[in-house]
Amino acid sequence: MGALTLDEWGIIALSLRVALVSVVCSLPLAILVAYVLARFSFPGKMLFDAIIHLPLVLPPVVVGFALLVLFGKQGPIGKVLDQWFGIVFAFRWTGAALASAVMGFPLMVRAIRLSIAAIDQRLETAARTLGGSRAWVFASITLPLSLPGVITGTLLSFARGLGEFGATITFVSNIPGETQTLPLAIYTFTQVPSGDAAALRLSVIAVVLSLVALATSEWLTRRVDPTGRQ
């Protein structure tokens, strides 16, 4: 199979950076959305929940096209970000991170939401009765008790980001050194006669990274589970 080339190491580094940035940027919003869905009832909640989980059921190409329309240089959001803040997503690695974040966001929200919903609300009520503000109760009780779900959701989203293909190639294309992540590079190598060995090497790396992420999620969840379950 041979050793990895410098270009292949660069592809791996770019993929890790894209996946890491996507989860770091989406985690605070995912925690907020999960908390709202788990603890509040409001008109339109079912619709809001459906919209959050829409990337799970939509073809990734549709998600990528929607991102291109919204965040492209001439899109309503992308144009403002470019002119006012100099932020460009289309055909940049930051766009790949955005696509990964959008595709992994439902997984993160779902894991955190289930973890929050499993917490006995009497604990939160007792803390509020003793004078704790909602923010204090969330930070000192709800968030620590939901940490296993946060870890699971984060690592699942990270693994999803490593494997993202359809939305990424539609939104930011397949530019070597800029947006060519692991799945896109594997696809590229399979299209050339001499690329089978490189495709195999990168496929093995992708499998290993995904297994490490899942194993780490399981191990950390057991370590921080406040119930002490093994």
Regions found by a protein language model. Name each.
Residues 1-24, 36-45, 82-86, 188-197:
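Periplasmic/extracellular loop-to-transmembrane helix junction in inner-membrane transport proteins
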Residues 44, 106, 110-124, 128-129, ...:
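C-terminal transmembrane helix and the adjacent membrane-cytosol boundary/short C-terminal tail
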Residues 1-7, 171-211:
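Interhelical loop and adjacent transmembrane-helix boundary motif
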Residues 21-52, 65-67, 115-117, 122-123, ...:
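Transmembrane-helix boundary motif in ABC transporter permease subunits
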Residues 19, 23-31, 35, 61, ...:
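Hydrophobic positions within alpha-helical transmembrane segments of bacterial inner-membrane proteins
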